[in-house]
């Protein structure tokens, strides 16, 4: 099971691969849409890659609730349990 720090680092790598953003830009308080400029198509790719990386399922209806990087970290952390 990945720690919250490992989840954050993994998400930063996934966002970097999808968008080219520097991993240092992917901070817990950042909004995926407002701060990181991630559109819905890129977000779905990030979700699929996160599911694969962390062995969790993020239901489509939950994706809209993942507003910030911390929201995603917390969801993945809870889904691992």
Swiss-Prot record:
Q: Does the keyword Transcription regulation apply?
A: no
How is it modified post-translationally? Answer: 4'-phosphopantetheine is transferred from CoA to a specific serine of apo-ACP by AcpS. This modification is essential for activity because fatty acids are bound in thioester linkage to the sulfhydryl of the prosthetic group.
Transmembrane region(s): none
This protein's major location comes to cytoplasm
Q: InterPro entries from the xrefs?
A: ACP, ACP-like_sf, PP-bd_ACP
- tRNA processing as a keyword of this entry, yes or no, is no
Pfam families, alphabetically?
A: PP-binding
An example of a GO molecular function for this protein is: acyl carrier activity
Listed under GO biological process in this entry are: lipid A biosynthetic process
Q: In which pathway does it act?
A: Lipid metabolism; fatty acid biosynthesis
Q: Where in the cell is it found?
A: Cytoplasm
In the record, the note on similarity to other proteins reads:
Belongs to the acyl carrier protein (ACP) family.
Q: Any idea what this protein is called?
A: Acyl carrier protein
Origin species, per record, is: Micrococcus luteus (strain ATCC 4698 / DSM 20030 / JCM 1464 / CCM 169 / CCUG 5858 / IAM 1056 / NBRC 3333 / NCIMB 9278 / NCTC 2665 / VKM Ac-2230)
Q: What is the lineage of its organism?
A: Bacteria, Bacillati, Actinomycetota, Actinomycetes, Micrococcales
């Amino acid at each position: 099971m990945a720690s919250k720090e490992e989840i954050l680092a993994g998400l930063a790598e996934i966002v970097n691969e999808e968008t080219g953003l520097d991993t240092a830009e992917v901070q817990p308080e950042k909004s995926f849409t407002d701060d990181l400029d991630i559109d819905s198509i890129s977000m779905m790719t990030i979700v699929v890659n996160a599911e694969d990386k962390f062995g969790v399922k993020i239901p489509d209806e939950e994706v809209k609730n993942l507003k910030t990087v911390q929201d995603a970290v917390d969801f993945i952390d809870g889904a691992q349990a």
